Swiss-Prot record:
GO terms for molecular function: uracil DNA N-glycosylase activity. It comes from Helicobacter hepaticus (strain ATCC 51449 / 3B1). One of its GO terms (biological process) is base-excision repair, AP site formation via deaminated base removal. It comes from the Bacteria. PROSITE patterns: U_DNA_GLYCOSYLASE. This is Uracil-DNA glycosylase. Keywords: Cytoplasm, DNA damage, DNA repair, Hydrolase. HAMAP family: UDG. The lineage of its organism: Bacteria, Pseudomonadati, Campylobacterota, Epsilonproteobacteria, Campylobacterales.
Amino acid sequence: MTINLDKIKIPDDWKQLLASEFLSPYFADIKTHYLNALQNKEMIYPKPHQIFAAFNLTPLSSLKVVILGQDPYHGSGIIEGVETPQAMGLSFSVPRGMPIPPSLKNIYAELSQSLHITPPTHGDLSGWARQGVLLLNAILSVRANAPASHKHFGWEYFSDGVIRALSAHKEHLVFMLWGNYAKKKAPLIDASKHKIITAPHPSPLARGFVGSNVFLQANIYLQEHAKEPIAWEKL
């Protein structure tokens, strides 16, 4: 199977915002690495048509919040008898029918504690994406069962470019940076016109995410700037 990343559709407004990224030498390198991996018969997650799912589900015009993840889930599970990747192109999200990963369970625990939201029974965060939450991974692909295996592709140049472009061309966005890796992206963001909310990573290996009030803080900021808050319970 081969795939041309240029042929994967994303909305025109995102294409225009990120035109210089897609035309850059580093993105040509990403495409070469990706094509080589496919030609080498690597099992790659998420599926090719879902690589840019975050941009397809979240209209640029209604963008309010960016939640930065690091690496796509590298595992899979069985849904209705079919082996299915955990990764679906949205940070922290897994398809309906997939067991909820530990980090997402902690995200739900924080929602329960701070906003009294009953934890969903699934891990599909598409409902957030459609409300204007960009669920962006810093690295957009991974080889099955091999975490960070595509780090050398150069995806982080792309995700850094996305963050810079949003910081420069949008106003009053909330950037959620959870964990030390994400916090290092703060210098890419103009804090004079955006809200940066940091917290420990929601992984059970870290402590302090539950009780951080990150979702409450985000909605307070949005309302202060005449924006509709995110209905975090709508999933």
